[in-house]
Amino acid sequence: MATVSMRDMLKAGVHFGHQTRYWNPKMKPFIFGARNRVHIINLEKTVPMFNEALAELAKVGEKKGKVLFVGTKRAASEAVKEAAIASNQFYVNNRWLGGMLTNYKTVRQSIKRLKELEIQSQDGTFDKLTKKEALMRTREMEKLEKSLGGIKDMGGLPDALFVIDADHEHIAIKEANNLGIPVYAVVDTNSNPDGVDYIIPGNDDAIRAVQLYLNAAASAVTEGRNKDVAVVAEKDGFVEAE
């Protein structure tokens, strides 16, 4: 079972919050104190909260649920994509387009267009076009891939959101709240924890910390999915034994 220890978190700098003047008072229960005008997050709270979140993510994986990893700022972007791909899940790592969840019908149309363009680029259609027209379609395809590439095979709304930086991704969280989709989020000392179902109090800027959260989340989802496979195999075994 994927778990993270206090030592792992200390090494990754999870305990370093933001400068005290930027704090959100709603994060007070998760703050240990301050050092050099920087808030220190209480890892005694973070460790069990994160491990509880991982256990729940494993359950989502076991039910073959879809997890959407969200992190669009530079420190998280690449790691978000890697975690989603490693766990066979989905991601938004460039820009959250308003309505990505709440207006999914429109998003679905854009995904359809992206897939059409991908086929055209491979089946020789682009070669039959004028250079200008081919270039325009290539640019359109690249633009759509950048914003929707991580969700083009999601095939519907996700069952959970795993968010890096609740403050930066507040629109995504609000949309998930409106649709009743559970939100797992890393919440730093400057962020509002409201609307987050599974709060992970921690540093949302340090790349090592961001990778720690994402690697653990990806492992939990994968373990859950594999557990389901093992159970099915076991059941099949019993059937054969009869």
UniProtKB/Swiss-Prot annotation:
CDD domains recorded: RPS2
Biological processes per GO annotation: translation
Database matches in InterPro entries: Ribosomal_uS2, Ribosomal_uS2_bac/mit/plastid, Ribosomal_uS2_CS, Ribosomal_uS2_flav_dom_sf
SUPFAM superfamilies: Ribosomal protein S2
Keyword Membrane: no
Pfam families: Ribosomal_S2 (PF00318)
GO cellular component: cytosolic small ribosomal subunit
Domain of life: Bacteria
Gene Ontology MF terms in the entry: structural constituent of ribosome
Keyword line: Ribonucleoprotein, Ribosomal protein
Family: Belongs to the universal ribosomal protein uS2 family.
Annotated protein name in UniProt: Small ribosomal subunit protein uS2
